[in-house]
Amino acid sequence: MHVLYIMGQDSGGLPHYTAELANSMSEYARVTVLKPNETSADEVLRDEITVINAFKPTDISMQNLFDLKLDVLDSIRGLFSFWNIKLINQIDPDIVHDPTDEFPQVNLFSWVHSVYEDRPYVVTSHETKHGGAGGVLRVVNPLLSLVPDFEKSAAIVHSADQRELLLNNHKAVDEVHVIPHGVYSFFRELDYDEQKEEDKHALFFGSLIPPKGIEYLIDAVPKVSEEVPGFSLTIAGSGSIPDECADVVEQYSDVINIRNEFIPNEEVGTLFSRAQVVVLPYRRGWQTGHSGTLSIAFAFGKPIITSEVGDFPELVGESGAGIVVEPESPEAIADGLIEVFSSDSALDQMSNASSRVADRLSWEKIAEQHFEVYQNLL
């Protein structure tokens, strides 16, 4: 079997997802990856995978859309470079899979070149419903609806709730399969500066965009600092911190350390090894099937404080890997952190549970489930 993956994004976690899936699938099939010239996962792809640098990078990401930081000309060049999706018909794989959330340029040029007509075409939907249709999404969503769609042979989602949403809202898909998001264990294998775990230290990691709810975590800092002596917080990722958080950030500058930049792969392990707890204060309304940050937290066996969104209650709460709190509530986040830091034995139990989840969501097991889907489509 020959599987071709389309990497529709050059930055963030989606290239990592594609690389991990391609690497593990190479144990079962011949694998080709069609990707932009430079991505955040280039060093992750195995040598045995055929890599074709077919596209130019785009400046389009959720972060840049929210921050209105787009280089229009570069973005247009990048988008139109996906014309090279036509290469799929020359390569002629048995399966085509877009695991990067159906970006519009991938859908458009897959439709233009009819790459779905002679072979099964699979997509992975990491986000099945975007909440908060205000702001930039009020403009973007109607534009996306203009992109031609076509019948997909199968869709992969990460939770049963996502499957139901997709079946109700996505007309152009034949079947929907639930396959969990694999754990990003490759970060542990990189050459990074491992740190001793720091007592009472929490980490927020990822793009600073509105759905991530960073303001609720920052607003929780005063209460946690009062109740937990020695508490500290690192916020690591590129994007914008809301202006209304400025007073708390300034007042608690000895508690909050902000690295407002893209974190290179080789520095991710340093941040996670140092953290005692990882916090995901995500907003409600964003139907996330998983999170790259959550995947990394599991890989490092970290206890997790997360909002009650998507399948986080099952992955974190029911597994015992952490505490699930009410979304958009600084008070709830603060109470969760205070509870976690109040018991060393609870921290140890959560850490062990987090590591068990990592074993259950290994990419070897995830690839096996994908391979079964592919086989049934042929």
From Swiss-Prot:
The protein's enzyme class:
transferase
Question: In a knockout, what does one observe?
Answer: Abolishes formation of the tetrasaccharide present at 'Asn-532' of S-layer glycoprotein Csg. No effect on 'Asn-47' and 'Asn-117' glycosylation of S-layer glycoprotein Csg.
| Pathway involvement of the protein, from the record | Protein modification; protein glycosylation; Cell surface structure biogenesis; S-layer biogenesis
Q: Which GO terms describe its biological process?
A: protein glycosylation; S-layer organization
Domain of life of the native organism: Archaea
Q: Which UniProt keywords apply?
A: Glycosyltransferase, Transferase
**Molecular-function GO terms, alphabetical:** glycosyltransferase activity
EC number(s) for this protein? 2.4.1.-
Q: Which Pfam families match?
A: Glyco_trans_1_4 (PF13692)
What protein family is recorded? Belongs to the glycosyltransferase group 1 family.
Its biological function? Hexosyltransferase involved in N-glycan biosynthetic pathway that takes place under low-salt conditions (1.75 M instead of 3.4 M). Participates in the formation of the tetrasaccharide present at 'Asn-532' of S-layer glycoprotein Csg, consisting of a sulfated hexose, 2 hexoses and rhamnose. Together with Agl6, mediates the addition of sugars 1 and 2 to dolichol phosphate in the tetrasaccharide.
Can you say what this protein is called? Low-salt glycan biosynthesis hexosyltransferase Agl5
